[in-house]
Amino acid sequence: MLICAIPLSTKPSRLHKIRTREPGGRNVLLNLTKRCRWFEFITPSTLALQPLLELLLQPAANEHRELLQLGLQEALVNAVRHGNGNDPAKLVRIRRIHSPQWLIWQVQDQGPGLQPEQRLALLPDELDAISGRGLFLMHQCFDDVRWSPRGNRVQLAKRR
């Protein structure tokens, strides 16, 4: 159950820098602040994610939709299970930012956060394991993945 979706009239106070993979490495953050649309979604910790995923993916082009859905679902499941410990009283906050050049999602939980060594996106030794591939998949689905210093917010960016 979605608690609220808020269109933000001004940009949030903190947005991590986005790395480009282009030669020359121009500053994409400058472009992001010019013509962006910002939305914030707040939801209780639940694994019933399909309605939320549909809202989050509205600005995504069809050719990227399945890949982005996989990566976002992994981020949301990690926030609910690992960050919030499946506690329905805890909330997950998602920001969706889109510009002509980028689609960006920030997923934040109320947990203690991942330590830097836990954020490595290594493929697990056991490929058929039930879990353990989420961070690896997020890095495969998005052009840029960054963490807040505390480790309880991940930013996922995909170039349009």
Give each language-model segment a name.
Residues N152-R160:
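Short C-terminal beta-strand
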Residues D143-N152:
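Glycine-rich ATP-binding loops of the HATPase_c
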Residues Q101-W105, N152:
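Short beta-strand element(s) in the Bergerat
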Residues D128-F142:
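Glycine-rich phosphate-binding loop
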Residues L91-Q101:
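Short beta-strand/loop element within the Bergerat-fold HATPase_c
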Residues Q106-I130:
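Glycine-rich/acidic phosphate-handling loop/turn and adjacent ATP-lid/helix
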Residues E63-P88:
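Conserved ATP-binding N-box helix of the HATPase_c
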Residues L2-L70:
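Bergerat-fold GHKL ATPase/HATPase_c domain
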